Design a protein with these regions (language model features):
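Acyl-donor (CoA/ACP) binding surface of acyl/acetyltransferases
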Residues: 1-36, 69-191
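Juxtamembrane/interface motifs at transmembrane-helix termini
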Residues: 43-46, 55-57, 71, 105-107
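A short helix-loop-beta-strand connector motif used in the catalytic cores of GNAT acetyltransferases and
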Residues: 55-68, 75
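Short, P/G- and charge-enriched loop/turn segments at secondary-structure junctions
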Residues: 1-2, 54-56
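Conserved GNAT-fold acetyl-CoA-binding loop/helix
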Residues: 32-54, 65-67
Length: 191
């Protein structure tokens, strides 16, 4: 299955490249996008460029990675066709799982785009490597991210502290489409 260009009912999902740097940086530098994990915010274009480098390496290694989401048509004044609504997709991590990732601009949140993109990404990952579990790791206070994981058919398989998070009271939830080995959970929950 070709995964670098997918179409859904409302979205065009394309591989993120350095041509997207300005829009990717604007998304990842937006404090509203990172309200659940402020330490993740990109404070420089160089950090966003390094992020795109890692995406491109992942495409070469995995055959799937992070996709940019653009509306296939105008969806109103705040969401004209062709703009980058966000990024998301599935990436192979630890050679043992598909990590489900999604991040939307504030204007694009609350319209069902995350669920639409996640379904396409999960279907593509399952076609490429059905032997790997689909996993989403989310912060407990990020209710919308939890809802997206649940809509993708994932179930909570772990809850505990979020090591490495500057907020020592943060709680991490791991969702998966099947039971995970103790070893993989241990790997996912280390700092």
């Amino acid at each position: 299955m070709e995964c670098s260009h997918l179409l859904t009912e409302r979205l065009i999902l394309d591989a993120v490249t350095h041509d997207d740097l300005d829009q990717v940086h604007a998304l990842h530098a937006d404090p509203q996008v990172w309200r659940h994990l402020p330490a993740g915010r990109h404070d420089t274009r160089e950090r966003s460029a390094a992020y795109i480098d890692s995406i491109e390496r992942g495409w070469a290694a995995d055959g799937a990675r992070i996709l940019g989401r653009r509306p296939g048509r105008d969806l109103g004044d705040s969401l004209p066709g062709g703009i980058l609504l966000g990024v998301g997709g599935c990436t192979v991590r630890h050679s043992a799982m598909w990590n489900l990732y999604y991040r939307l601009s504030p204007a694009a949140q609350g319209h069902g785009f995350a669920a639409e993109m996640v379904k396409a990404a999960c279907d593509a990952a399952a076609d490429l490597r059905p032997d790997l579990p689909l996993v989403a790791s989310v912060l407990a206070h990020n209710r919308s991210s939890q809802a997206t994981a649940l809509r993708a058919g994932l179930k909570q398989v772990w809850r505990g502290p979020d090591p490495g998070n500057p907020d020592v009271s943060a709680v991490r939830l791991i969702y998966a489409d099947r039971p995970l080995s103790d070893g993989l959970i241990e790997t996912l929950t280390r700092p």
